[in-house]
A protein has these predicted regions:
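N-terminal intrinsically disordered/low-complexity leader segments
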Residues: 1-10
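Helix-turn-helix
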Residues: 10, 14, 18-55, 59
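Solvent-exposed, amphipathic alpha-helical segments
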Residues: 18-25, 71-75, 106, 155-159
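Short, basic, alpha-helical segments at the C-terminal edge of helix-turn-helix-like DNA-binding modules
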Residues: 32, 62-69
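Hydrophobic alpha-helical connector segments
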Residues: 59, 73-100, 148, 152
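Amphipathic alpha-helical segments used for helix-helix packing
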Residues: 97-118
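Short, solvent-exposed amphipathic helices
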Residues: 115, 119-133
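Hydrophobic/aromatic-rich alpha-helical bundle segments in the mid-to-C-terminal region
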Residues: 117, 121, 136-185
Length: 185
């Protein structure tokens, strides 16, 4: 027998995951009352997990960093195989996790929340270092190494806009074509 929803105590991570989804889908609804409503709890639950709005804003940016960057990097570190194989794993993870949608939403939100700029800079640096390492492991050298790294980031950031309406099969075919493009010498 399940616990009634009203008696469940949500975790801080549940609040943050719901907030990130709202931010990506409908940023104008990123409000405490809307998050609480979607979680089926009162606003009081919010203040159990967050001291104030600033704590929430900072925590959401850090949650985004951890969920969409650090966890991906940690997964890559556990992968065996060639650098090309690891790049393919990275590309699949990014597509499956809606990473680009979350990234665009958080970056747009940062225009109104300047205190999250340091987290965004940290994420950018972590991602560039990781990609640079993968491409260097494939044997690419400067200046192509830097250009390939930055081009990958740009291409991936906007790719989801070009794949709207594609079947899963078509999306995977395009992913494979992009992978071949980025690993080609």
């Amino acid at each position: 027998m399940g616990t009634p929803k009203s008696r469940l105590r949500l975790t801080r991570e549940a609040w943050l995951a719901q907030a990130l989804d709202i931010l990506a889908d409908d940023p104008e609804h990123l409000r405490i009352d809307e998050i609480a409503s979607r979680l089926g709890v009162s606003k009081g639950s919010f203040y159990w997990h967050f001291e104030n709005r600033s704590d929430f804003v900072r925590s959401l940016a850090e949650f985004w960093r951890d969920a969409n960057t650090q966890s991906v990097i940690d997964t890559l570190k556990q992968q065996v195989g060639t650098p090309e194989d690891r790049l393919y794993v990275l590309m699949r993870l990014l597509v499956e996790q809606k990473a680009a949608q979350y990234d665009l939403a958080v970056r747009a939100w940062a225009r109104h929340e300047p205190e999250i700029a340091p987290v965004i800079r940290e994420v950018d640096e972590l991602r560039l270092q990781t990609l640079r390492g993968l491409f260097a492991d494939m044997g690419f050298e400067e200046p192509e190494l830097s250009m390939r790294t930055r081009t990958f980031v740009i291409a991936h950031s906007f790719n989801h806009l070009l794949t709207v309406g594609l079947s899963r099969k078509e999306a995977l075919e395009q992913l494979e074509a992009r992978h071949a493009f980025f690993t080609r010498r």
